[in-house]
Amino acid sequence: MKATILLAVLVAVFVAGTEAHSHACTSYWCGKFCGTASCTHYLCRVLHPGKMCACVHCSRVNNPFRVNQVAKSINDLDYTPIMKSMENLDNGMDML
């Protein structure tokens, strides 16, 4: 019973200090949460010196926290013409 009340109080304090913004919490580090996509919805936690923020919705699917999409995009890089030419260059350097 006491644990439930304590948990409810902690959640209430966290929610009270949390602000959801579209653009108010943007910064260089917050934008990096989305990788190459841009963030459309930030979740900000107000701290004493400033704000700690995280992106909760990216504008595109390219989200670093979605493992399948990242793995797919990394695997797709192996088959680009630039990567093939770099592989050929590496093979040529190995022969020397």
Swiss-Prot record:
Alphabetical GO biological process terms: defense response to bacterium
Tissues showing expression: Hemocytes.
Annotated propeptide span(s): 61-96
Function as written in the Swiss-Prot or TrEMBL entry: Bacteriolytic activity against Gram-positive bacteria M.luteus, B.megaterium and A.viridans.
Domain of life: Eukaryota
Compartment(s): Secreted
Keyword Signal attributed: yes
Source organism of this protein record: Mytilus galloprovincialis (Mediterranean mussel)
The UniProt record lists the keyword Protease: no
Segments passing through the bilayer: none
UniProt protein name: Myticin-A
GO cellular-component term (any): extracellular region
Post-translational modification: Contains four disulfide bonds.
Keyword tags: Antibiotic, Antimicrobial, Disulfide bond, Secreted, Signal
Signal peptide: 1-20
